[in-house]
Curated annotation (Swiss-Prot):
Gene that specifies this protein: CPK17
Compartment(s) where it occurs, according to its Swiss-Prot or TrEMBL record: Membrane
Protein name from the UniProt record: Calcium-dependent protein kinase 17
Lipidation (N-myristoyl glycine): 2
Residues engaged in binding Ca(2+) 2: 456, 458, 460, 462, 467
Binding site for Ca(2+) 3: 492, 494, 496, 498, 503
Keyword Zinc set for record: no
Tissues of expression: Expressed in roots, leaf blades and developing seeds.
Gene Ontology terms, MF aspect: ATP binding; calcium ion binding; calcium-dependent protein serine/threonine kinase activity; calcium/calmodulin-dependent protein kinase activity; calmodulin binding; protein serine kinase activity
Length: 568
């Protein structure tokens, strides 16, 4: 193989078009995820759609109440973190060192994105005028010692991997009274699947170039003792919009340092990309190769290898589902590509390719055997649909919640007041944890965080009254005809009997939702292909996948806020 099986360099990656694809997560009562059927794809047992944004979406933590620490046999006590209860801030330093003031060195600009723990801004270095990104993590949201350790570890890992051409460069970490600020390289070039779709042509050779970047990052992490644990397309961004823009990995929030031979049990990651041994709570670094294999499968076909209409269904497919190499476009894809994917998605981690072996595979290596002929145009269509989330259902649930009578929601209103201990009109993560414990819910912090993320429609970091009602109202209210019609009428501004793209755009603006790829939302729901959503199509969308999963138990890993609060 000579010198062909080496990690990707900026020169080798010039024609890769990396961007991030958002995991398809549809809002459902109780915070469960529901993918929808991608049009134009042969019928399967399940379906999928997703959200695309200018920033990487929140990662999903697949929680389990019986999990042990992510690092086994840690030994010793964690440092005590003193809290100022009145202010909700960490009194001790997160960084454990004196820090220069961020505002003395940088000027903060526009907000680029917001997640559960932090907000990312564009910032400018005063001394040089260089444009960078600043991720500000609110210290009031670091409510446990584990949260603080996670932030410290993320910073350590980013410094540890510094210098790799496909890892975002960290410039510095700063701390003040209210937040920890991570200043890093700005990746403004957009997301993987969007870039592919924009170009309008796509070949196996191009997919192999992208695969080389992904696998190269995995190899670099493993060689430096880092397990990523959350590899997915949305964790890769282009630096700029140029044709030869480098592709960078941007998120190490779930990454850990590992020791060869040790096994880990925290069930973390994102449903479509999680390895089977993670679900079995006994795994090592091989999980990253599995996740990379899933991404490559999607790059070649436009759909994930394992999907279903519920997270539980996805997990069952991951554990025992068959790989589909018979449906289009797989018959036209080279045997070498299928060989790589099959070996990366071997359920036995001992037989799975290592990252280095995958990087040396003939289909991946520089000047390898990947053909340059275009892939089926349907792949581009599916990639586009895979990267657009149906946010309409989330908004519709909120509309229904806000139109319920006082009698219907009286009990939920009192529950909201009970949780909102400071009467701010917002339930914070800490308030949710306290409230759930008061009602006897035996949930781990990671599980409660998952509930929070699902209920927080606008990603503000807290749950307002409308979001709370939407997350906890009973399913029979969602499916009641008068409520469905009222919700439809809210979007149908001109009472034409149809929801148009312009009307959907206005609704997104009212809800504070950014670019939602409206054409793809409509296409996903529009069964008669007239470019509009009629009432029957709207009702079908609202009723699809509403079978409750129930609280997590022996065979279930998903649960909803309604169940957690014991509301039946």
């Amino acid at each position: 193989m000579g010198n062909t099986c080496v990690g990707p360099s900026s020169a080798a990656d010039r024609h890769g078009f990396f961007h991030s694809v958002s995991l398809a997560v549809l809002w459902r009562p109780g915070g469960r995820a529901e993918p929808s059927q991608p049009p134009g794809y042969p019928p399967r047992e399940s379906s999928h759609s997703s959200v695309t944004s200018s920033t990487a979406p929140e990662r999903v933590t697949i929680a389990d109440s019986d999990l042990s620490s992510s690092t086994p046999n840690k030994g010793g006590n964690k440092p005590k973190v003193r809290r100022v209860q009145s202010a909700g801030l960490l009194a001790d330093s997160v960084l454990k060192r004196d820090s220069e003031r961020l505002k003395d060195l940088y000027t903060l600009g526009k907000k680029l994105g917001q997640g559960q723990f932090g907000t990312t801004y564009q910032c400018v270095e005063k001394a040089t005028g260089k444009v960078l990104a600043c991720k500000s993590i609110a210290k009031r949201k670091l409510v446990s010692e584990e949260d603080v350790e996670d932030v410290r570890r993320e910073i350590q890992i980013m410094h540890h991997l510094a210098g790799h051409p496909s890892v975002v460069s960290i410039v510095g970490a700063y701390e003040d009274a209210v937040a920890v600020h991570l200043v890093m390289e700005l990746c403004a070039g957009g997301e993987l699947f969007d870039r592919i779709v924009q170009r309008g042509h796509y070949s196996e050779k191009a997919a192999a170039q992208l695969a080389r970047v992904i696998i190269g990052v995995v190899e670099a992490c493993h060689s430096l003792g880092v397990m990523h644990r959350d590899l997915k397309p949305e964790n890769f961004l282009f630096v700029n919009h140029k044709e030869d823009s480098p592709l960078k990995t941007i998120d190490f929030g779930l990454s850990i340092f590992f020791k060869p031979g040790e096994n880990y049990s925290d069930v973390v990651g994102s449903p479509y990309y999680v390895a089977p041994e993670v679900l079995m709570k006994h795994y090592g670094r091989e999980v990253d190769v599995w996740s990379a294999g899933v991404i490559i499968y999607i790059l070649l076909s436009g759909v994930p290898p394992f999907w279903d209409e519920s997270e539980q269904g996805i997990f069952e497919k991951v554990l025992k589902g068959d790989l589909d190499f018979s449906s289009d476009p797989w018959p036209a894809i080279s045997d070498s590509a299928k060989d790589l994917v099959r070996k990366m998605l071997n359920r036995d981690p001992r037989k799975r390719l290592t990252a280095h072996e995958a990087l040396c595979h003939p289909w991946v290596c520089v000047d390898g055997v990947a053909p340059d002929k275009p892939l089926d145009s349907a792949v581009l269509t599916r990639l586009k649909q895979f990267s657009a989330m149906n946010k309409l259902k989330k908004m519709a649930l909120r509309v229904i919640a806000e139109n319920l009578s006082e009698d219907e929601i009286a009990g939920l209103r009192e529950m909201f007041k009970m949780l909102d201990t400071d009467n701010s009109g917002q339930i914070t993560l800490e308030e949710l944890k306290t409230g759930l414990r008061r009602v006897g819910a035996n949930l781990k912090d990671s599980e409660i965080t998952t509930l929070m993320e699902a209920a927080d429609i606008d990603n503000s970091g807290s749950i307002d009254y409308g979001e709370f009602i939407a997350a906890t109202m009973h399913l029979n209210k969602v499916e009641r005809e008068d409520n469905l019609f009222a919700a439809f009428s809210y979007f149908d501004k001109d009472s034409s009997g149809y929801i148009t793209q312009d009307e959907l755009q206005k609704a997104c603006e009212e809800f504070g939702i950014g670019d939602a790829h409206l054409e793809d939302i409509i296409k996903d729901i529009d069964q008669d292909n007239d470019g509009r959503i009629d009432y029957n199509e709207f009702v079908t969308m609202m009723q699809k996948g509403n079978n409750p999963l129930g609280k997590k138990g022996q065979g279930q890993l998903s649960f909803g806020l309604r169940e957690a609060l014991k509301l039946g």
